[in-house]
A protein has these predicted regions:
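Short, charged/polar micro-motifs that form catalytic or ligand-binding hotspots
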Residues: 27, 94, 154, 158, ...
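Hydrophobic, aromatic-lined core segments that form the binding pocket/scaffold
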Residues: 176-368
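Internal, well-ordered alpha/beta segment that forms a basic, Gly-enriched binding/recognition surface
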Residues: 87, 95-182
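General N-terminal leader/first-domain-start detector
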Residues: 9-60
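Membrane helical hairpin/interfacial module
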Residues: 40, 44-78, 83-86
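Immediate flanking context of iron-sulfur cluster ligation sites
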Residues: 14-32, 66-101, 118
Length: 368
C-alpha cells in the first residue's frame, strides 16, 4: 500500500504501519542458531525492574543476584544467566511470558513514532527476521491500521517526508533499472531534497524523481576499498568482524574480474538488495522529521548496500563461488549487529559522510 499519510479524518486518529511479513514472524526459541540471549547485554526496563524486585522465593533471589548496578543482567560465560541448557528462558518458564522485560518481548521488532504515525518492523540482526526480509522476490509491501495517538511532531513536514520516502520506494522497486542505478538515483534525489530543506524551501521539495543517465560513469575501485577499510575503524561489537573485513579486502587484488563474475551470478536475485535498501529507508528515513537530515539517512542506506555487497563477493569467493540465501542472511545479520546495534558506529558513518572526501556527492556515486 501507499505509505503517504491520508489527510482529514478524526481528530487524533493516527496510522500504524507494518511490513506485510511483520505478523508472520515468531521467535523459534531454542532452535535458533544465533541466540539473542548469548553475547547481548539485556537491559531491564523500569517496569520489569520493579516486578523482578518483588518476585519471591528462590527464583526471586536469583533474579536479584544476577542484576548489576546498570540495571542489566550480568552475562555468565557470555550467556544470559536465565538461558537454560536447552536454550530456553527460565524467566518465561518460571514467572510467565508477560514478565519478560521489554527488550526480550519486543526484539527483533522495532517501533518508531512520528506524531500521528507509528511504524513497526523487524530488525535485520535476527536470522529468523532477516529471512522474512530477504526470502520473497516480490516487492516489500506495507499494511496500515488506525489508532489513537498523543505524541506531537511537525505533521506538515512529516507529510513531505512520507512523499519523499514513497518516491524513493518507487525508484527502489523499479526493476527496469539495475540496482546500482537505483541507488544513484535516490542519492541524487535526496541531495536535491536536502538542498531545499537547508535553504528553508521545504515547500519546494521535488515531488518527483528525475531519472539520470549513469551509463558513462565508471566505478572507482579505490574508493570502494576505502569504504570497506572504514569498517576497521568501527567500535567492534562482533568478534568475527575484523577478520571478515580483512578477508573482504582481499577481493580488491582482482576486483574487476571478481565483481563482474559475481554481478552475473547474483543478477537473478537483485531483489535481495532491493529489499535491503527498502528496509534501511523504511527504518531510518522518517527520523529526518526530528533532525531535518534526509541525505544522511539515504547515504547510510547506500553505504550499507556497498559494504554488504563487498562482504557478499568475499563470502561467495570463500564458498567456491556459491552464495545461498543463508549466506545472504549471515552477512546482513553480522553487519546489522556491528553497525545498527551501536549508535557510535552509526554516528561514525554520519561523520564520514560530512568530512571524508570519498563521500563528496559526485564521487560517492562512482563507488556504487
Amino acid at each position: 500500500g501507499d505509505c503517504r499519510l491520508q489527510t482529514g479524518g478524526m481528530e487524533n486518529m493516527g496510522i500504524k504501519r507494518v511490513p506485510t511479513y511483520f505478523n508472520e514472524f515468531a521467535c523459534i526459541g531454542g532452535a535458533c542458531e544465533d541466540n539473542c540471549c548469548i553475547g547481548w547485554e539485556v537491559d531491564i526496563d523500569d517496569e520489569s525492574l520493579e516486578v523482578y524486585k518483588s518476585v519471591g522465593g528462590e527464583f526471586g533471589d536469583k533474579l536479584r543476584r544476577c542484576m548489576n548496578d546498570e540495571n542489566s543482567f550480568t552475562l555468565k560465560n557470555n550467556r544470559c544467566p536465565f538461558l537454560n541448557d536447552k536454550n530456553l528462558c527460565d524467566i518465561f518458564i518460571n514467572i510467565g511470558e508477560d514478565k519478560l522485560c521489554t527488550v526480550c518481548t519486543e526484539y527483533p521488532r522495532f517501533t518508531e513514532t512520528y506524531g500521528s504515525l507509528t511504524e513497526k518492523g523487524l530488525g535485520m540482526s535476527c536470522e529468523s527476521a532477516a529471512e522474512f526480509i530477504f526470502k520473497s522476490d516480490k516487492p516489500t509491501g506495507f499494511e496500515t491500521e488506525k489508532f489513537d495517538y498523543e505524541e506531537e511532531c511537525d505533521e506538515d513536514f512529516l507529510r513531505i517526508l512520507l512523499n519523499v520516502r514513497e518516491n524513493i520506494f518507487d525508484v527502489l522497486k523499479n526493476r527496469k533499472m539495475n540496482i546500482s542505478d537505483r541507488v544513484k538515483t535516490i542519492l541524487n534525489y535526496a541531495y536535491d531534497v536536502q538542498d531545499k530543506i537547508n535553504n528553508n524551501n521545504v515547500d519546494k521539495v521535488p515531488q518527483s524523481v528525475d531519472n539520470c543517465d549513469f551509463s558513462q560513469s565508471e566505478k572507482c575501485i579505490n574508493d570502494i576499498k576505502e569504504c570497506v577499510k572504514l569498517c576497521l575503524s568501527l567500535e567492534i561489537m562482533e568478534d568475527s568482524w575484523t577478520g571478515v573485513i580483512e578477508n573482504t579486502l582481499g577481493i580488491f587484488d582482482n576486483y574487476d574480474n571478481l565483481s563482474g563474475e559475481f554481478d552475473l551470478y547474483i543478477s537473478g536475485r537483485e531483489y535481495e538488495y532491493e529489499n535491503l535498501l527498502v528496509y534501511f529507508i523504511y527504518r531510518y528515513l522518517l527520523k529526518a522529521v526530528f533532525d531535518c537530515d534526509v541525505l544522511t539517512k539515504v547515504r547510510f542506506a547506500a553505504v550499507s548496500y556497498v559494504i554488504i555487497r563487498q562482504l557478499d563477493i568475499a563470502r561467495w569467493l570463500r564458498n567456491g563461488k556459491e552464495f545461498s540465501l543463508k549466506d545472504r542472511i549471515k552477512n546482513c545479520v553480522l553487519y546489522s549487529k556491528e553497525v545498527e546495534h551501536c549508535q557510535d558506529n552509526i554516528d561514525f558513518f554520519d561523520e564520514e559522510f560530512l568530512f571524508n572526501p570519498i563521500f563528496e556527492h559526485n564521487r560517492f556515486l562512482n563507488l556504487i
